Regions:
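Conserved redox-active cysteine motifs that mediate thiol-disulfide chemistry
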Residues: 92-112
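Thiol/disulfide oxidoreductase modules built on the thioredoxin-like
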Residues: 134-141, 148-198
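Thiol-based oxidoreductase modules, predominantly thioredoxin-like and allied folds used
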Residues: 116-131, 141-151
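Conserved hydrophobic/aromatic "anchor" residues
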Residues: 66, 78, 92-93, 135, ...
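Hydrophobic beta-strand anchors of alpha/beta hydrolase catalytic cores
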Residues: 89-90, 120, 165
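A short beta-strand-turn-helix
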Residues: 58-60, 65-88
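N-terminal targeting signals for export/organelle localization
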Residues: 1-69, 198
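Short pre-active-site segment immediately N-terminal to redox-active cysteine/selenocysteine motifs
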Residues: 86-88, 93-96, 161
Length: 198
């Protein structure tokens, strides 16, 4: 069998990203792996203990606060600290990430279903602002979506996989995270528990 080139092998495991920012992606990914335990207090648990949502991790500790500009011009800044009192679904995405785009309709549907009870916030990083804005418009996402230009918030949350969804309790403490694409049913399972606890 012919040997694959280095570029072909890399493309099998890494989504295509904008060329100017690929080097930064590699740096924060390594740093995120090193910080995954310390940054957000990740504790791996079995799926059974988390309502059988595949790929979820239980989290401990307080969510790191941030204030970032919204991807869309003219909107107020996105400040996590101001969202306490209700659970928060924090979704990390990028315009070049296919699974991120596929899950957006489910996230939007759930944001409408739980309106007034749960906050939904997107965070785009390692991305171009214009491209991220276009994706939000194309997929009909209306909840706040922050622009993380230096990937600082992604590093704080030790994001290793795109997309990643972090669930935060009404008290501002981390609860769970889902690495990779999430479905509407999986969102309901976790969010219902958050709402019951708040």
């Amino acid at each position: 069998m012919p040997r694959r080139s280095e570029r072909e092998s890399r493309d099998l495991i890494e989504p295509e990203a904008p060329a100017p920012r690929r080097r930064r992606w590699g740096w924060w990914l390594v740093a995120g792996l090193a910080l995954v335990g310390a940054a957000v207090g990740v504790a791996v648990t079995t799926d059974d203990s988390l309502g059988k949502v595949p790929g979820t991790l239980k989290l401990t500790g307080e969510a790191k606060t941030f204030t970032l500009d919204d991807v869309r011009s003219g909107r107020p800044p996105v400040a996590l600290e101001g969202l306490r009192g209700r659970p928060v679904v924090l979704n990390f995405f990028a315009s070049w990430c296919g699974p991120c785009i596929r899950e957006m309709p489910a996230l939007q549907a759930m944001s409408e279903h739980y309106e007034g009870r749960v906050h939904f916030v997107g965070v785009t990083f390692n991305d171009r602002r214009e491209a991220a804005r276009d994706v939000l418009e194309r997929t009909g996402v209306t909840y706040p979506s922050a622009f993380d230009p230096d990937s600082d918030v992604a590093l704080d949350y030790a994001v290793r996989v795109m997309p990643t969804t972090v669930f935060i309790g009404a008290d501002g403490h981390l609860v769970e995270r889902k690495d990779g694409e999430i479905s509407e049913r999986q969102l309901r399972t976790v969010i219902d528990r958050l709402v019951d606890r708040s």
